[in-house]
Amino acid sequence: WVFDSQINLKGGYSEVTSRGVSKWINSERKQGDSDYMRIIAATIDGRLIALESATGKHVASFGKGGIIDLKEGVGEIQVTSPPAVINDIIVVGSTMGDNWRFDYPPGVVRAYDTRTGNLKWSWDPIPRKSTDYGFNTWIGEKVQKTGAANAWAPISADPANDLLFISTSCPSPDYYGGERKGYNVYANSIVAITASTGKVAWHFQTVHHDIWDYDIAAQPLL
């Protein structure tokens, strides 16, 4: 079979690459069943798609007819890396053209149930509340509108320890930090997240207050 995701080729995307797809084995099915294995793909026009690997058809029970609109509630994001699949959870980051303005969409990482597509958790790499860790590392009146710090590189997964390892990028805009003074935790960081809860286990920031577009572009190697 051949599957065409029907992407709008005139969408004016900031990125036009796709680094692959992922798979999930359904432990509630046996090999040979149409829904034994699913192909999980994310598109540059911001959709998460689940297909039956045997037929190439959308999984009707996933999201809305096999599709989730990742832009809903977030904004003009794209996805260029394959989703991570860990312990019946799909985890997806995003990419965006983050050097055009400061108020870009947030670089949220989201986790979905592999069977239903229901949202399990979302994590914003920019602390928005005073009770969030790292909130005091973002200083400025416009910080609440600062976007990006997104995870556009592939995400690594350690199922045995229930951990995800996420590489984040610089905040928006890339080359001017006057509206986001401070260290800007969790931008430009390797972040370990508990997959089942979406809570941060630990992080290491490679660049404090990035104004050079020093995204962590590589997938963490375990």
Where is each model-derived feature located?
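Short Asp/Glu-rich motifs
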Residues: 102-103, 132
